Amino acid sequence: MDRVALRGLKARGHHGVFPKEREDGQTFLVDIVLGLDTRPAAADDDLAKTVHYGIVAEEVVAVVEGEPVNLVETLAERIAQVCLKHEGVEEVEVCVHKPDAPITVPFDDVTVTIIRSRV
């Protein structure tokens, strides 16, 4: 299976368990890796035969900027489901970064990574 990756998609969301996270919001970063067969698109040099990653990026940002959820795990699941709706995408790996998570000790990043496939 081939891979198309989008790294470092950035969007502001109001996700989190604490009221301050919901009120103020924070920046989330998202990395996605789409699993699909790119051979038909490559053979014909035809965008219509592959995933349009610009559209996927816009949809992912819309999820992050959309309805708030408590857990990063839930956000990752919603992003995965949006990606799997694209024809030809058989698998997706989603990594959501929450670099400003409310943690009381020094840290670089918090991430949740999930892998989902078509059933």
UniProtKB/Swiss-Prot annotation:
GO CC terms of this entry: cytoplasm
Alphabetized Pfam families for the sequence: FolB
GO biological process, one term: tetrahydrofolate biosynthetic process
Binding site for substrate: 21, 53, 72-73
Pathway note: Cofactor biosynthesis; tetrahydrofolate biosynthesis; 2-amino-4-hydroxy-6-hydroxymethyl-7,8-dihydropteridine diphosphate from 7,8-dihydroneopterin triphosphate: step 3/4
Sorted UniProt keywords: Folate biosynthesis, Lyase
KW Cell inner membrane (keyword) present: no
Record field: catalytic activity: 7,8-dihydroneopterin = 6-hydroxymethyl-7,8-dihydropterin + glycolaldehyde
GO MF annotations, alphabetized: dihydroneopterin aldolase activity
Organism superkingdom: Bacteria
Tagged with keyword Lyase: yes
Covalent S-S links between cysteines: none
Catalytic site positions: 98
InterPro entries membership: Dihydroneopterin_aldolase, FolB_dom, GTP-CH-I_C/QueF
General function of this protein: Catalyzes the conversion of 7,8-dihydroneopterin to 6-hydroxymethyl-7,8-dihydropterin.
Family: Belongs to the DHNA family.
Name of the protein this chain belongs to: Dihydroneopterin aldolase
Organism encoding this protein: Streptomyces coelicolor (strain ATCC BAA-471 / A3(2) / M145)
